[in-house]
Amino acid sequence: MRLRKKWWARPEIEASDKFADEPKELRGKWNKEFNNNNDIHLELGCGRGGFISQLVEKNKDINYVGIDLKDEVIVYAIRKVKEKEEEVKREFKNIKFVTMNIMGIAEVFDKNEISKIYINFCNPWPKERHNKRRLTHTKLLTEYKKFLKPNTEIWFKTDDKELFEDSQEYFKESGFNIEYITYDLHNSDFKENIKTEYETKFETMGMKIMFLKARLL
């Protein structure tokens, strides 16, 4: 679905201290931006922030960067974090948001700068000629490896079986070991799951969610 342009989105996100306006200038300097040496985790395609806002609240000693393509999406993610701050009466200083095309992500993060990646319900790009746009494709996994620390995990969730099975091959081809996998996350023994907005919706529809953890060898 194409988002309608919202003229007010860019001014609103630029006014937020949780928005990184020039992310390429922070390459190799993200810990300085957060003013600590804590691990940095990414959510690629963070959407409206339902998932990452829960992580930020739960793990104050981990820094998070949420990335999405459109200002019109990130503006709601920033609002979601603000709502969470008001709810718990605590300011979150461990979160930044970026609007960018993930294809250029290696220009934003430096070697060994990132400790974990979350990819939730990304576009499955079912047409073969578009497969390289998948966030789990070998082309992008190769880019991620440029800035991931050794033994880094990528957590991947989807409702699309074809994407899930293709992604297993992408991870293996790219030097990752799949350490956990389930085709029915909500009926599995995995206890660390945090639900996204899409996931909650899919659950009410009776759809099965697939999940894997892949570790960089």
UniProtKB/Swiss-Prot annotation:
Transferase keyword on record: yes
Gene Ontology molecular function: tRNA (guanine(46)-N7)-methyltransferase activity
Residues the entry annotates as binding substrate: K127, D159, T196, E197, Y198, E199
Keywords linked to the UniProt accession: Methyltransferase, S-adenosyl-L-methionine, Transferase, tRNA processing
Signal peptide: none
Keyword Amino-acid biosynthesis applies: no
Domain of life: Bacteria
Cross-referenced PANTHER family: 3-DEOXY-D-MANNO-OCTULOSONIC-ACID TRANSFERASE/TRNA GUANINE-N 7 - -METHYLTRANSFERASE, PENTACOTRIPEPTIDE-REPEAT REGION OF PRORP DOMAIN-CONTAINING PROTEIN
Pfam family, one: Methyltransf_4
Family, as annotated: Belongs to the class I-like SAM-binding methyltransferase superfamily. TrmB family.
Protein's pathway: tRNA modification; N(7)-methylguanine-tRNA biosynthesis
Broad EC category: transferase
Binding of S-adenosyl-L-methionine, residues: E43, D68, N101, N123
Name this protein carries in UniProt: tRNA (guanine-N(7)-)-methyltransferase
Organism, scientific name: Clostridium botulinum (strain Loch Maree / Type A3)
Job of this protein: Catalyzes the formation of N(7)-methylguanine at position 46 (m7G46) in tRNA.
Spans annotated as Interaction with RNA: 129-134
This protein's GO CC annotations: tRNA methyltransferase complex
The EC number(s) this enzyme carries: 2.1.1.33
Catalytic activity: guanosine(46) in tRNA + S-adenosyl-L-methionine = N(7)-methylguanosine(46) in tRNA + S-adenosyl-L-homocysteine
